[in-house]
Amino acid sequence: MAGPELSVPATKTYTTQLGAMAVLAVALSGGGIGVAELQLVPAAVAEMLEVAPAAEALADRLVAVETLVVSGRGYAYSTALELSLKLKETCYLPAVGLSYADLVHGPIAVVDAGTPALLVAAGDGPMVPEMTGLARRLAATGAPVYGIGGDQEFAAACRAALPGPSLPEHLAPFALIVPGQLLTEALASAKGLDPDAPRGLDKVTQTGA
């Protein structure tokens, strides 16, 4: 349904994995989760493609960055990990993906004026205020804080933020990754790199017995 995965950094694969998990959840819920909700996803993903110009502007801010901390919580945690992986693969940026809890437990000490943070949050749900508080806490250290998703207060707490989807929190990951993918593509291009063919990567990795 998604077509061949041509790019070495597998973006379609990630989204279709989310889809497979969602379909499984619908099947196991015995009617508790409706298919109608999933039908909201395609339009939300398409809407996120319009974020490309803003993603290019944010990429310009990050082009000279040497390291980056990416963090999310709840349903957005997987998005943060996937985004940090794509930044490493395609932009050769040593991005560290951490959950909110792991970050504030100790590694938060490395975030300063020379180490930006990229925070990812759904547009609603109980995690948004906590991510907003984290953005403010990091900004108080002088760290450049950038965001993806969240609400207006979250965006205001960040130096710059890319909008996220208007989806319930449990569906947000489908479209929340798209601004991150656009940012990754723009940052790789700004560095003169080919985001579809990173060095040292093959389509299939054999790890041996």
PLM regions: where:
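A SIS-like phosphosugar-recognition module
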Residues: 1-209
